[in-house]
Amino acid sequence: MEVVIVPDAKAGGELIAEAMAALVRRKPDALLGVATGSTPLPIYEALAGKVRAGLVDASKARICQLDEYVGLPTGHPESYRAVVLREVVEPLGLSEASFMGPDGSAEDIVAACEAYDRALAEAGGVDLQLLGIGTDGHIGFNEPCSSLASRTRIKTLTEQTRVDNARFFDDDIDQVPHHVITQGIGTILDARHLVLLATGEGKAEAVAQTVEGPLSALVPASALQLHRHATVVVDEAAASKLKLADYFRHTYANKPAWQGL
């Protein structure tokens, strides 16, 4: 696992956007897994800026979803399908045909989960998966005590996650669904490159447990320790509880440029 400490969220977004752009230059039809929430917005803004400036041609890139609420009506503005189309697909100039995600409105949710895992495999696998992290260490919607071998499935949200997400529903927790479809930890680990971005002091403890704590289902993000190519990008506030912060700064400062992220 590589840990990169950046000054702020904007710097983290630019760094990751350039890594995504470099991937698309090497592999124009790369399958990019995206996350929702406020944390990755600087990434999407920076990547869209590169597309507009002609620095990368993303016209053949493909986008896939990490998770989806269960039970929101089709077209609900806070369904993750709608969010990804609005914040990622459209700004990159891509069509909806380039996008794939689980069906949270399906009658048979179990079948929809299995179908999404198959679709990801049939698409050749995810080349780069973006991740955020919850204050309790969850990734996707794999809450604490999720199986580290889990596949795409339905999960019940913790009350803390519902509280955290109420800001997207007019601060009304009653509007936040109780269930989601999420890629499992095992599904996430299938991606070729995992990139986790965390910003703010509120994420510092979760970051420290992920990077320096034991591998544990209590901290789902700690599964990144098992991945052959995992990158954790954090701002100074989110890095504030890392015991090895100085070491991480030193190794990144002396990293050969040709290695990339």
Label the model's feature ranges:
Residues 56-130, 246, 251-260:
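Ligand-binding beta-strand-loop-alpha-helix segment within the catalytic cores
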Residues 186, 190-261:
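ATP/nucleoside-binding phosphotransfer catalytic cores, i.e., glycine-rich phosphate-binding loops
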Residues 33-37, 65, 102-103, 130-133, ...:
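Short beta-strand segments
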Residues 1-32:
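N-terminal glycine-/serine-/threonine-rich phosphate-binding loop
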Residues 46-57, 82, 144-154, 213:
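A glycine- and small-aliphatic-rich helix-loop capping segment at beta-alpha/alpha-beta transitions
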Residues 30, 39, 43, 119-144:
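A glycine-rich beta-strand to alpha-helix segment
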Residues 136, 140-185:
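Class I SAM-dependent methyltransferase SAM-binding "motif I" and its flanking Rossmann-like core
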Residues 26-52:
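Glycine-rich N-terminal segment of FAD-binding domains in flavoprotein oxidoreductases
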